[in-house]
Amino acid sequence: MKSLTAVCQTGASGMPALNASGRIQRHPTHRGDGENAEMKMYLSKLKDLVPFMPKNRKLTKLEIIQHVIDYICDLQTELETHPEMGNFDAAAALTAVNGLHEDEDSDMEDADAEAEAEVDPDILAQRLNAEQPAKVSSPAARLPLTDRQTPNTLVAPAHPQQHQQQQQLQLQQQQLQSQQQLSNSLATPQNAEKDSRQS
């Protein structure tokens, strides 16, 4: 009998280990289980929000995050290239949103009285749009992921000259990188020829 308990205590027989009182030891609970479950929930939501996410295989957390970032960059590119973007004033929009939130906080008691009174349709539409949660569009209506070639900027520079200088600087950096890659690729065969001559 002692050999049986010795085997059980080491766990070599596949049976659970026994403690000193002869009871089965349970595995301690993991502290990160709640956090892990919450992270899985958020990753699952992200997978549902981003279109063209591979469904036929299990994705790592990093792959999911990369797809999300790529999709956000694509949306930002589309926003930047939208024809109305030139007419958009980000500072005025932010000021209007902040003013709307301040008005909602200070006038919460008066909201019931105003609702009964006649309200301007434009103001009503603005409030409804601000209060509605963002609707999730169907995956078919979303844009596909592509490689991003432009910098990650939301608002165009204030001066056109700065924008032009930034583009020229980026072009120079790309040319320098391509030249370095070319010189590295040319240097490798030359080194191989030298090594073969020496031997």
From Swiss-Prot:
GO terms for cellular component: cytoplasm; nucleoplasm; nucleus. Residues 161-182 have a biased composition (Low complexity). Disulfide bonds: none annotated. CDD domains: bHLH_dnHLH_EMC_like. Residues 127-199 are annotated as: Disordered. Keywords: Nucleus, Phosphoprotein, Repressor, Transcription, Transcription regulation. The keyword Phosphoprotein applies. PROSITE patterns: BHLH. GO terms for biological process: chaeta morphogenesis; chorion-containing eggshell pattern formation; compound eye cone cell differentiation; determination of left/right symmetry; dorsal appendage formation; dorsal closure; head involution; hindgut development. One of its GO terms (molecular function) is transcription corepressor activity. SUPFAM superfamilies: HLH, helix-loop-helix DNA-binding domain. It is found in: Nucleus. InterPro entries: bHLH_dom, DNA-bd_prot-inh, HLH_DNA-bd_sf. This is Protein extra-macrochaetae. It comes from Drosophila melanogaster (Fruit fly). The gene is emc.
